[in-house]
Amino acid sequence: MVDLEHPDAVQYIAREQQYLAEQTEPWRSNLKEMMSELNAQLSIERKTTPIVTGDFEYYSEIRKGHQYPVYYRRPKTLPGDQQVVIDLNELSNGTDFYALGGFSISPDEQTVAFTEDRTGDGNHTLRLRNLDTGVVTTIADRLEPKLAWHGDAILAIEKETNSVVEHLPDGQKTTLYRETDPAFSLSVRTARDRKTVIITSESHRATEIRTLSPGGELQLIAPRQEGHRYRLMIGVDHMTVLSNYKRPDYALAFLQKGEVDPSDWQFYELRLPGSVVDFERYEKFLLVQVRNRLRDQLVLIDPLAGYQRSILVTGAGESFRLMQPDDGAEPGFQFRIRSLIQPERRYKIVVSEQVAHEIDSDSAPGNYLRDQYRVEEHWLSARDGVEVPVTLIYKKGADLASRPLYLTAYGAYGVSLPIAFDPTRLPLLNRGFVLGIVHVRGGGDLGDAWHFSGRHLNKENTFNDFVDVANRLVESGIGHPGMLAARGASAGGTVIGVVANEAPALFKVLVADVPFVDVLTTLLDPTLPLTESDILEWGNPDVPADARYLFEYSPYQQVREQAYPHVLVQASRNDGRVGMHEALKWIAKIRERSTGGALQLVDIEDHSGHLGASDQYLRRRKQALEYIFVIQGLGLRD
């Protein structure tokens, strides 16, 4: 089944798709209505806040009826003179999938280099577009998405060799650096000084950064060291690092060229609890984002003067996203406030004032009234006594104890699920659902210690947290015990797979999106692109203790004879991270072993990868099926 082009696999997939069509035929009118609700959101036009870089302001816009954004620029002295940088609607013509990887403007501001994925498999092609003539030239393919200019050349990551390769517009190429450890991935980017290229080698446990200046040699910032992770920002007159060398929850450090030993770095003591998750620098000031118990705080500091001032703190269900500082008429910091129940707002801090001012915000659907919805944060005890947070959103009104509860989690790699307004949640919220994000161990919501307590030989904590929070919510009067549903994507799909085996009666409906469910077998295959890095997170099956632990929870291996709930699997044919065959054989095994009459379906996207379809209407179709499957599975009338 691994070879999806094998005739037997082709026939099997066709039968699976036919079965899906047959089973969902009675829901045709429900699906049509749900699609109509979801597609109504696509009429909203979206435009980003201009960012000043060099002599231009850059911004993007999605217009009504268009699938993709158009990226524009205009001279900062002539704001009405608009020029197209990249039109993704034009570039995507003739493809069933299109994703922009990254783009960068040349030092002379005459050419844009960009990478694109036209199949969903994660392989990107490097192309150049002349901004005066509009002529597009293809340079190289089978690349990672990141890129950076180095003089007249473009640096990109060659996937097959895991190398930084310098490409000239005429097609010549030179390998500058090759990463030999398969556990490490490479990325490149242009520094804030707009001259230096930053080359990062990173695994789940360590970082190593090199820089490349115009006409110079590769310079090592700090050699890789087990457990040391760091990020680098280079300005015109400074180098600033965010590092966990001195503090597990990260600290800022200032360094001089040649200081490759972190013990020589000058660390700044931020007198606040929590994790430093991001920062920006403008002139002598730093804007620092600190996260403590799910609350983000923005702190403005002058490290030379020892000055430190809190600017803003988020509430429940909110987060900050720092933006590149503005070099316009009123220079200063910019950031976004994201909320689960309010469209994104953008703010600016003019350094001379040291106060945040709202500059614009996204539009809400025409019939959306924020005051009708509520966000709550609860901290609930897991079975080992650890308090696990969950963020809930719902529409005000009926008693919460009588409502359907739909939970989600991720819980791996120290990654947090995004906190942002999503109008596609409204169909469920308006039908009375309580939606919840469970911030399980293994994720990054509460810092590195939270991540480490849910990885490797602590992985069971991730799954137990999810089950325990669901039970505690119902016990506290949130959610009807017979109307619980859950979803998870990728590593979050592992959570769903374990829950299906270990707590099959708790949730009536489960949704697993591109799920990682054959954990043990996948980690045993060294030919897969992510195996060497993933064993640092999940464990090494060549180590007996790790193999036993993995076997005891790996969803596919632990399918057993019992009554399973309704399960919808969403799979992508071109998924380069989690093979579609995992989901297919997992569902087949559940159907074979299940003693109940619940429905197990697989929804296969033919033209997408791990992150799903790029076509907005196809994304809504997938979402509509998910919502109707959950509604029908819970026995609700729609």
Regions found by a protein language model. Give the residues of each.
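C-terminal substrate/ligand-recognition segments
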Residues: 244-245, 275-293, 380-389, 433, ...
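Active-site-proximal cap/loop segments of hydrolase catalytic domains
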Residues: 440-638
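Cap/lid segment of the alpha/beta-hydrolase catalytic domain
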Residues: 89-103, 115-121, 351-353, 360-485, ...
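Extracellular/periplasmic ectodomains of large secreted or surface enzymes and adhesion receptors
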Residues: 302-305, 309, 323, 327-338, ...
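Beta-propeller folds
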Residues: 1-332, 340-344, 348-349, 422, ...
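Secondary-structure transition/capping motifs at alpha-helix termini
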Residues: 77-79, 119-121, 132-135, 215-216, ...
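Glycine-rich His-Gly loop
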Residues: 62, 338, 408-414, 490-493, ...
